[in-house]
Curated annotation (Swiss-Prot):
The active site is at residue 22. Its EC number is 4.1.3.39. This is 4-hydroxy-2-oxovalerate aldolase 6. It comes from Rhodococcus jostii (strain RHA1). Substrate binds at residues 18-19, 172, 201, 292. It is an enzyme of class 4 (lyase).
Amino acid sequence: MTRPELRDDVRIVDTTLRDGSHAQSHQFTESQVRDTVRALDGAGVEVIEVTHGDGLGGSTFNYGFSRISDLELVQVAADTAEQAKIAVLLVPGIGTADDLRKAADRGAEVVRIATHCTEADVSLQHFEIARDLGMQTCGFLMMAHRTTPEELARQARLMVDAGCQVPYVTDSAGALLMHEAKDRFDALITEVGDDAWVGYHGHQNMSLGVANSVIAYEAGVRYIDGSLCALGAGAGNSPTELLAAIFDRMNIATGLDVMATLDAAETVVRPYLNRWPKIDRNAIVQGWVGVYSSFLLHAETAGARYGVPVHEILRRCGELGYVGGQEDMIIDVAIQLAKVSGTVSEPSASLVAG
């Protein structure tokens, strides 16, 4: 196995059309995908991720239904991109090997296979299949704050030995402080740096995604994720346009045209935003107690339904140690909090229908 060849000093991977799907309630249209891919492609972005926020197969009752299927959106993206590769996310247990094969048939050339930070073993067959399909492979070790740097590195080694070319420190909760992030970058690079690149995926819940991206590069990380307008779960991701500007100021080559990324954010993405990612009480609580960023909208729905403050739901989810895939437990938390506070109320007709 070889590492993907790097065009520049660092590769900025854009996840507007995947992580951003959480903030858009998975309602991207074909025209939005087409226009966003065209703008990112023209700005020099080399890898553009496109799927439901929870990856291939994520359009379900538990995670939220997509307006348009993943495969259709991947096809639109692949048909639009001229130089960029289209990536998909696959979470074993949500997406299947068959989903991956179909995505590759529609034009996906990169797959990012995601597991909880201590469960890399469930991804091994998926990496083997992806390599057999000729795809570039990245591995997301999600909720990276929930284990030690040493254990995270051991999990990265499992992925790399199975065919992963780029294991990621994935700060799904936006919880990592700067020294904690660096410890994890150093551990992964020491363990797998001779065999694979290391990546970083951050969230802005504690306003540290961008700072940690700079620390990541200085530590030797060479794949860094961003999202136009920070569009993503929780308080959003590190803004792609901001990463482009910062690395340009640092004389670090990204291959991105700074003005073109700014134009993409302001003239393409901003007009279709359902909500602007923001660092508010709810998002800060997610980063503070380490809650999976995509829990935010689910907690807002449950809070409105049962008359419970959203930040209290999120805080309790953190105390209980819930991880990605346990979104269904948010309702239980809201009900229990409502019982304690005496605010149990019947769901409104509109909430039941929606």
